[in-house]
Amino acid sequence: MVMGVAMHELGVLNQVVKTVGRIAEQNSIVSIRHITLQVGTVSGFVPRYLTKLFPVAADSCPALQKTKLRIEMVEGRGLTIKEIGY
């Protein structure tokens, strides 16, 4: 794993965890089963790194301790939270 690339993914995952954690808290959700991210094919994000690093980012949020990360590749450059399953 190239550290610079991995840090890029970790930073984005930290934002995803922060956002989903806030949504869970606002809605009194104690456990999130899965998060589906749509990742653009030319976004520069490496799905394998996102998957490997997700548990590291999720460790900071109790509601995400057992969450499975799902990744859907789509056309484009972005990364979007498509679905939060609870």
What are the roles of these predicted feature ranges?
Residues M1-Y86:
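Charge-rich, low-complexity N-terminal segments
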